[in-house]
Amino acid sequence: MTEYVLLLIGTVLVNNFVLVQFLGLCPFMGVSSKLDTAIGMSLATTFVLTLASVTSYLVNQYILIPLDITYLRTMSFILVIAVVVQFTEMVVRKTSPTLYRLLGIFLPLITTNCAVLGVALLNIKEDHSFLQSAVYGFGAAVGFSLVLVLFAALRERLAAADVPTPFKGASIALITAGLMSMAFMGFTGLVKF
């Protein structure tokens, strides 16, 4: 049990996919201008990352390895991710039309979020078990969500702040992301892998 807790904490804080591994930067910068949209994107990405991580593990273990077609791993994982995203899109459209409209184009773009594919491929590289894959996917999603929501809250505060003209927009956003990354470096050494 301790192993899974350490894996979760390590994935969320120490090896954060956005701030440490630089995966998922497109939605991080694109959806983080409003807190409501960031929360919705976080929920959708959490669902997709966790489900895609587990599904990719199953596809790898029970289809690709037995048939000796592991060279199709990346293509297979992209297909699995696309199916999971389409399923998520249908669920969000039925349950929350407002959130569906708010997310707009970003919901289908989860398919191309490199963090989702990165989690699936890193599960294989790290030789995780089924449960470890689920925890790793969930931890990556929680870390992504945490950073996205914090960054969106900071950007809303920055929109109301008196920022010098040369730093407005993407400039101050990148500086803020860099400061967040340095803050997360403080968690280095918290969990040893």
UniProtKB/Swiss-Prot annotation:
Biological processes annotated in GO: electron transport chain
DNA-binding found in the keyword field: no
Transmembrane segment boundaries: 5-25, 39-59, 63-83, 102-122, 134-154, 171-191
UniProt keywords, alphabetically: Cell inner membrane, Cell membrane, Electron transport, Membrane, Translocase, Transmembrane, Transmembrane helix, Transport
Principal cellular location given in the protein's record: membrane
Localization per record: Cell inner membrane
Membrane topology recorded in Swiss-Prot or TrEMBL: Multi-pass membrane protein
A GO CC term attached to the entry: plasma membrane
Record flagged with keyword Cell inner membrane: yes
The enzyme's E.C. designation: 7.-.-.-
Purpose: Part of a membrane-bound complex that couples electron transfer with translocation of ions across the membrane.
Subunit architecture: The complex is composed of six subunits: RnfA, RnfB, RnfC, RnfD, RnfE and RnfG.
Entry's family note: Belongs to the NqrDE/RnfAE family.
Official protein name in the record: Ion-translocating oxidoreductase complex subunit A
